[in-house]
Amino acid sequence: MQSSKGRRKVGSTTAGAGIDSAEKLDELLISSAICNGEDLGPFVRKTFGTGKPETLLHHLKFFARSKESEIEEVCKAHYQDFIHAVDDLKSLLSDVESLKSALSDSNSKLQSVAAPLLSSLDSLVEAQTVSKNVDLAIGAVTHCVRVMELVSRANQHLQSGNFYMALKCVDSIESDFMEKTPSSTLKRMLENRIPAIRSYVERKVNKEFGDWLVEIRVVSRNLGQLAIGEASAARQREEELRIKQRQAEEQSRLSLRDCVYALNEEEDDEFGSGHEGSDGGSSGGGLLGFDLTPLYRAYHIHQTLSLGDTFKQYYYNNRDLQLTSDFQIAGFFIVEDRVLRTGGGLISKLEVETLWDTAVTKMCAVLEDQFSRMQTANHLLLIKDYVSLLGVSLRRYGYAVDSLLEVLSKHRDKYHELLLSDCRKQITEALSADKFEQMLMKKEYEYSMNVLSFQLQTSEIVPAFPFIAPFSTTVPDCCRIVRSFIEDSVSFMSHGGQLDFYDVVKKYLDRLLGEVLDEALLKLISTSVHGVSQAMQVAANMAVFERACDFFFRHAAHLSGVPLRMAERGRRHFPLTKSQNTAEDTLSGMLKKKIDGFMTLLENVNWTSDDIPQGGNEYMNEVLIYLETLVSTAQQILPAKVLKRVLRDVLAHISEKIVGTLCGDLVKRLSMAAIKGLDVDIQLLDSFTENLTPLLTDKEAREMKKAFVEIRQMINLLLSSHPENFVNPVIRERSYNALDYRKVATVSEKFRDPSDSIFGTFGTRGSRQNPKNKSLDALIKRLKDVS
């Protein structure tokens, strides 16, 4: 209990000390805030918040008592200075009184002296007023004189037609003089006459502008013709330059001569550059031959009259009416281009584009309608050329012509269909006039026109004249038609906005050759070829057409601006393959019919004879005579490769005919002598083939002999000592691969020795059988088993 009481006493002592220190801290804070001029609001709020305002009052009183001693010390320090200042003020009172009396005396003297001066000043002011009135009168008179001078000058300008200067005078009078004019009469006159003068000037320039609108219609027509003509001449120069370039490239490729290069100087003309002089006064002259001075004068006058926007709209409306009524497209828009660039804002680019869009829409509609009605390719080409020239002419002035070119491109297929139809008629007429005779050329120009121009020559050496060509007149006639088609197609495709159009030209050229010319030739072969000579001539023509087709594609590539290597890379097969094969098949068929006539002599052959014909059978001699005659004639017309194919077919037909005869009912039995006679016949065919050495190489001669390999192997089999070897697969593949086992069985049965038959065995019973016959019997038996 004692210890707890002791702790309480210590605690109360500590709390009392804490309260004293807190009060001292508050006094210090308040003193510091007052000294520093800080706000005492927080202290007041805190004090009232605790409910003890007497503490704050106690602190403030304590602070005031602490500052009283300081105030007393300050007063004691400055007491003597206050006393001295009061003494100084008392000493100044006497000086002030003396100064006041001196000022009063000076004022009296000044008033006495200034009285005469005031009267003089009044006189001066009166004189100045009179002078000012006189000056005003002189100024008014001078003003009126200047106004009258301007009026006189305006009248002179009006009389001389210098309306702009007259309006400038009127504007000067109105803005600078009329409000200041002192004469009411003169002012009323000016107010009445100035609007009349402006109205007069407006009427005069509107009349001049109306005359210009009438004149520019004729000028636009002539200007358009001149522009189109210039574009056409420029295109012609480009074509001539391209032709020279192609010739130079060809000569360089062939190394015929050294190439000579030169600069081609061309004068820059009005149309070529599309930019004229910048003289805004004449705005027309030069090569174009039209004057915009009346237009610009009217525009300038209306701007001076503050009617510029009205005149712009008036001009645009009139030009729009002229465009829809006259439709002079080229000249109209050349004029508008000049006005746009030199008119000083008379017409905006947007307005020109609006007029151009209107014209393009109308032209596209007209072209669509006209193209849909046209049934002649030449008419469509003429329209296309004119439209493309129009596009070239106006493109130089920055007009967009893509819509027009799209219309032309859209009718590309129709144009080519019409062109194909025209060429079909021309080719049909050319083929119907063909006499199937070799073409005779008497002069060198005929050779150049019919052979060299289409690169049909097989040698660079010019032949002697008269020259008989291996082809008939239909070949150059058809070549001219095809060349014209190519040139017309290129003409339509060029200058149309499409740079690479060779593929399009090639596509339609393929159609012309593959559909039109090929079908026409097929029809000619099927309806008009009735003899070997005619068939041979057609086959010869087809070989020449093969060279001509190479020229056609090269010519199309040249005209299209495509390098030959690229054109050769995209080449396809010969487009006249059908008619070429048909012509050769027709010739082969006719020759086979001729051969069949000679092969009927096989009926006269004694197939059971024991005598071998030393010079061959009659039918073979006749066939060889005909073949030799045929070759001697065909060599002059047919190319070697065509003649080889035809001869191979004929020889194969001879072989088939002989084998067919051996297998047929005509031959009942074959003797060894008959087989050896056939061997002689085949040897004659071998000799004939070998005699074709100038025409054939050794390899080709061996290939030619394969045409009658069937009859050769048949004879070799029948003459062999062991015909049974035929059934040996290895031997058959090596020596008898062209033989059919059924034919072998039939011929072997006929070739069997009659002594080996059933009735022949009675006379030879007990004798030994011939080994060859035994082998043949075994072959026949084996073949029967197979069948």
Swiss-Prot record:
Family under the similarity heading: Belongs to the SEC15 family.
Subcellular location: Cytoplasm, Cytosol; Cytoplasm, Cytoskeleton, Phragmoplast; Secreted, Cell wall; Secreted, Extracellular exosome
Protein name (record): Exocyst complex component SEC15B
Taxon lineage: Eukaryota, Viridiplantae, Streptophyta, Embryophyta, Tracheophyta
Biological process, per Gene Ontology: acceptance of pollen; intracellular protein transport; pollen germination; pollen tube growth; vesicle tethering involved in exocytosis
Domain of life: Eukaryota
UniProt subunit comment: The exocyst complex is composed of SEC3, SEC5, SEC6, SEC8, SEC10, EXO70A1 and EXO84B. Interacts with EXO84B. Binds to EXO70H1 AND EXO70B2. Binds directly to B1L.
GO cellular component terms, semicolon-separated: cytoskeleton; cytosol; exocyst; extracellular exosome; phragmoplast; plasma membrane; plasmodesma
InterPro entries referenced in this protein's UniProt entry, alphabetically: EXOC6/Sec15, EXOC6/Sec15_C, EXOC6/Sec15_C_dom1, EXOC6_Sec15_N, EXOC6PINT-1/Sec15/Tip20_C_dom2
Annotated function: Component of the exocyst complex involved in the docking of exocytic vesicles with fusion sites on the plasma membrane during regulated or polarized secretion. Involved in polarized cell growth and organ morphogenesis. During cytokinesis, involved in cell plate initiation, cell plate maturation and formation of new primary cell wall.
Alphabetical keyword list: Cell wall, Cytoplasm, Cytoskeleton, Exocytosis, Secreted, Transport
Main location: cytoplasm
